[in-house]
């Protein structure tokens, strides 16, 4: 068993970049300071997790802690994460463009609502896949889940390969028949339930809880 702290970050279009990224850092700082007293949590045994855009925030948070030499999470769980907004065309060229739930063209829509300045898409906060190598070395261990029917499929695998090449302990699991967001379907999908269970076991082992 573990305690879970769910963070509500500000959303676009009411607030734009980098509000959600700032919120992720603020939440991490608060948890580091308060978790022990409030919830009896060991700050040295905390993981971060996020799906889709939340996976972007989790990946960025880990990189920022490396860059700033701050307290790093012990583990990162990235669920079909959004890891680059630099070139939406790479999503469109992928066979996974025809995903049932979400498409690359929809990411163009998201990008326009979050980024007031489209040239910021190469900012390391928006595209952690392309962050400098010095921000990637020393990252906490990672487990990355990707889906077969998802325009984010390729960048998830690319990030896993990149982290491994830099000595970061990284595993990935591909659910080839599933689509983006499938972990929200545990009430109707046995595959989603199995994936959620496996992700929990992997995280628990990484934190020394299993």
State the predicted function of each range.
Residues 1-210:
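Alpha/beta-hydrolase superfamily serine-hydrolase fold, recognizing
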